[in-house]
Every structure is written in C-alpha cells, then in structure tokens.
C-alpha cells in the first residue's frame, strides 16, 4: 500500500486519525514575493539499492499532530534552502506518493529565513527546509515554527533535533577540510581549525565561502564554543592569509581537485559527489576532525512547519515521508549525507556518524544567525 493510501485511510503511526487529503480544500496560499516552482508529480524516483540492509523505524500508533489544524489544502508550499538539483527528485516523488501539489521556492537558506521573518503572518510558506540548524533555530527563536509531534521527533537522535521540539533534522552533514593529496600531506593539516591562522604554509592556498549557509552555521558554532573574540580573530586571520573566496562549497572542491588551491573549508559530501560524477579517483581527500574541534561540526539539514501554515497536516505528512526509510536512503545514496533515521546506514565510504566525536554543542544554540551575519559584515566578508 502506498503512503498516500495510508494517509487517506488513516493507517499507521502519524497518519492515524488524520483527515488529510480526502477532505482537503484546494485554496491557494497567499501571494509570495517570488513564485515557487511546482514539482511535477509523476517524474517518479526510486532510490537505488542500499549498500546494506536498512530497517525503517516503527512509528507509534495513534500519534496525533500537535500543529493546529486550519483550513487544509492539498497545496504545500516549501521554502527550500536546499538546491533543486539535490532534493527536487525526492520532492517530486513525495508529491506523487502523497497526492500533494508541492510548490517550492528555492533559494539561499539565510535569505529564505529572512524572507519568512519579513513576511510574518502573511508568509505563504507551509514548510521551511533549511540546510543548517542555525536558520531553523533563528525562525524558532522568533516564534515562526510550530511544535512537531513527538512521534516524528523521536525518530531522530536527540542531538539532531530541536530541544524545544520546533524542528527536526532530516540528514547530517559534517564540516571537513578538503585538501589536494598531490600537494598536501595529511599531517600538514592543523590539529584544530583555529590553528590555520598565522600559518604561512597556507597563504593564498585556502578557499572558503563566507556567504554559504553551512559556513555561517560553523561560524556561529565557533562563536558559541570559543567566544566572539576567537571567532573574529579566526575570520580576520584566514582573510589575512589571502584565502580565496568562492560562491559555494562545490566551487571550492573543484578548485582543490584542479590544484588552484590546496585546501578549503567545506561539507563532507561535495567531494563524494565529484568522485561519483568523475567515475575515477580524484587527487583530493576530506580531513575529518574527530577530536571535538569546532572544525568537525556535525550539522543537519532540517525542516520546520510554520505556525501560519494553511496546510499543516499535509506539511506534517511531508515531514513524515522525509523521515521514512526510502527518503533516508535517498540522502545516504544520492546526496552522500548521513541519514538520521535509526537503521539506515550511511554510504560505506564514510566513517560512521557515531565515530566522529563532534563538538559538544546543542544545535539549538546555533540560532543567532543575525549575530553571525553582523560579524561577517564587520570583518568585510559580506
């Protein structure tokens, strides 16, 4: 039985007792500043075989949503800081399986979060899909996200969901230092991310992307863990080393592979995608900090349902699907991120998530996006 049928018939877990799609109204959301893209259901996307057997979590029967039900709609509007190339196929499948008209406004995570804050109660968004916990926390802090059902939250380990039950991680991503293996020896990578500063070995050989949401979340983590002065000094120090500025992580990875730079600060999965596309070994590796260093931050891409959603039941059904085995396998196998649903294994080329020993940091503490943006502006990086 397809997941859409479970919803319509009031089947298992979170879907029990929902009057979701059978009695939906088709009211359009209010006008949006930038028209979202409608994901055409029917494209279809079947995940490839899992590297190893993966068991789906068992939902709690009879769980009911804690989001207030309003006039419901089969149209769900998502503000997505995740790119269309990464999650478009998955959202197409979800729309098809759930019988939803999924409309997506793609953009920069921080900019979309700001747009939601500016739109306030007029926002047409039902669901925010951010590429980092910082933006989700910023929306939660401003009261824009509704509490999520415990049944959904409990599918994800506690470190990767909101301590206030306002957002939930969908996939994990790890900050790494990518380096060119033909020009850099592994032992040359500093023992801490902060030790790059003042090291002339790296002058004009580093790459970073200060406008990237994941980088900004890392800066927030550095502020929380080491303080404002250390974070400012690190930014100023890397800038003083004439680090090359890139628009995004993928550009840093490509430049490292090509030998244009020797190392850069990125998320782990970009190199794996380049390898998959190339179909051959590449002269680059990821250095994982496994000593609790801020440079080894494990962040999440996650979702939250807006308090103003006019389709909150449908939005929750979408979250339910994102935390199902098929969707989690998609993230493991197609985007090379860490699945967060218990029983679904990461790609075999990745170190196990439990072995990474990330910094002891509550991801809910990454909510001061405004402070990080202000700091980046002050040091001339924005």
Question: Residue ranges of each PLM-predicted region?
Answer:
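A bilobed periplasmic-binding-protein/Venus flytrap-type ligand-binding module shared by bacterial periplasmic
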Residues: 176-183, 298-311, 330
């Amino acid at each position: 039985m397809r997941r859409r049928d479970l919803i319509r018939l009031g089947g298992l877990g979170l879907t029990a007792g929902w009057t979701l799609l059978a009695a939906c109204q088709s009211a359009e959301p209010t006008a949006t500043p930038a028209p979202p893209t409608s994901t055409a259901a029917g494209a279809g996307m079947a995940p490839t075989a899992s590297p190893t057997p993966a068991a789906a979590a068992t939902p709690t029967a009879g769980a009911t949503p804690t989001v207030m039900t309003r006039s419901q709609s089969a149209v769900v509007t998502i503000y997505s800081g995740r790119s269309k190339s990464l999650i478009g196929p998955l959202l197409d499948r979800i729309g098809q399986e759930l019988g939803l008209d999924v409309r997506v406004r793609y953009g920069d995570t921080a900019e979309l979060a700001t747009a939601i804050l500016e739109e306030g109660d007029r926002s047409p968004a039902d669901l925010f899909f951010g590429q980092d916990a910082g933006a989700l926390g910023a929306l939660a802090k401003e009261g824009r996200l509704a509490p999520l059902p415990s049944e959904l939250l409990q599918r994800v380990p506690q470190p990767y969901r909101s301590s206030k039950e306002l957002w939930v991680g969908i996939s994990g991503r790890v900050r790494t230092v990518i380096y060119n293996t033909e020009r850099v020896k592994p032992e040359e990578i500093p023992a801490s991310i902060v030790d790059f500063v003042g090291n002339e070995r790296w002058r004009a050989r580093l790459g970073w992307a200060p406008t990237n949401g994941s980088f900004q979340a890392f800066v927030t983590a550095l502020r929380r863990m080491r303080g404002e002065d250390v974070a400012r000094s690190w930014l100023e120090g890397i800038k003083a080393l004439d680090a090359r500025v890139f628009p995004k992580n993928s550009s840093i990875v490509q430049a490292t592979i090509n030998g244009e730079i020797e190392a850069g600060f990125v998320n782990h999965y970009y190199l794996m995608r380049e390898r998959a596309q190339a179909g051959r070994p590449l002269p680059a590796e990821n250095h994982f900090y496994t000593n609790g260093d801020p440079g080894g931050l494990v962040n999440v891409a996650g979702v939250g349902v807006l308090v103003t959603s006019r389709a909150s039941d449908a939005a929750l059904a979408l979250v339910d699907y994102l935390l199902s085995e098929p969707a989690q396998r998609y993230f493991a196998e197609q985007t090379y991120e860490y699945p967060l649903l218990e029983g679904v294994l990461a790609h075999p080329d990745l170190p196990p998530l439990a072995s990474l020993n990330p910094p002891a940091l509550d991801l809910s503490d990454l909510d001061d996006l405004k402070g990080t943006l202000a700091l980046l502006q002050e040091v001339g990086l924005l």
